[in-house]
Swiss-Prot record:
Underlying gene: glsA
Keyword Hydrolase found: yes
Keyword line: Hydrolase
Name under which the protein is recorded: Glutaminase
PANTHER family with a match to the protein in the record: GLUTAMINASE
EC number: 3.5.1.2
Amino acid sequence: MTAPGSASHDAAHDPAHALDLDRLLASAADDGGGQVDDSIPQLAETDPSLAGIALVTPDGRTHAAGDSAHAFSIQSAVKPFLFALALADTDGAALDAVGIEPTGEAFDAIKLESGTGRPPNPMVNAGAILTASLVRGSTLEERTARILAGLSAFAGRDLEVDEDVAECEQLLGDRNHALAHLMRSEGTLHVSADDAVAAYARACAVLVTPEILAAMGATLACGGRNPLTGSRVVSREVARDSVSVMATCGVYDGSGRWMRRVGVPAKSSVSGAIVLASPGRLGAAVFSPPLDDQGTSVRGAVLAQRLADELGLHAFGGTGGRERA
């Protein structure tokens, strides 16, 4: 799908105007492997053959192919947006509460920064639980309403929570509860552990599609202004900080390899989605449920690299190199 009239649109404003996304998607059809996440039943039941891609450009045009309208829970792809909302609602003080350094640990490691008791960065579970707790609201209900409204502003449309997913995330998220209690014991988390996990679980359960997620990425890529609505969602500084941490930490302990190969700030998720934000260029989302050992979509990573190569999106120029042993 391409917005009407985009073929004649100025390529400087619409870098994807001549890109054949159907061809790009088909080129990755044989890039299989990986396993669908089974941490909750709703993810385990996902059709592994689903695949979609969507782009949103600074002038608000949407390009999409494949299963770009398929709805799924946003899962960890919500983390850069939670960080942005926390930064906005605390006037930047969230940077004192959570680190911004990469970690070689697993995304759900029961570990905090030595000496500070802070989560290492907002892209791991501990960091996202903490940033969700920093979003404005004196009660859990107020906080979760603010999170949903904020995510909807990033998307440019009203979003909904999959209540079944939210319930499963809370009931089966023992490690997240452990992280929250650890942060409480360190004096880092200032709401109850149960409320912190509940806010994060509901954020992960928000329903999106590749097209919606691409619009959210585009809002960060456009300096905090939603290109579909024209509304400012967060400041340029907040958008910059969120995208910066996506670049260094968004694919967990594979972030260095990702930036070498793809060169675009991104956040992976166990739903099989990857959201990308290429500053000043576009927002994108790729979706394919089977994951590698680090929880990143196998086919999605291939699509992201080919997209970056074709549009020259690599932050450091050129195209991504082959993976080396």
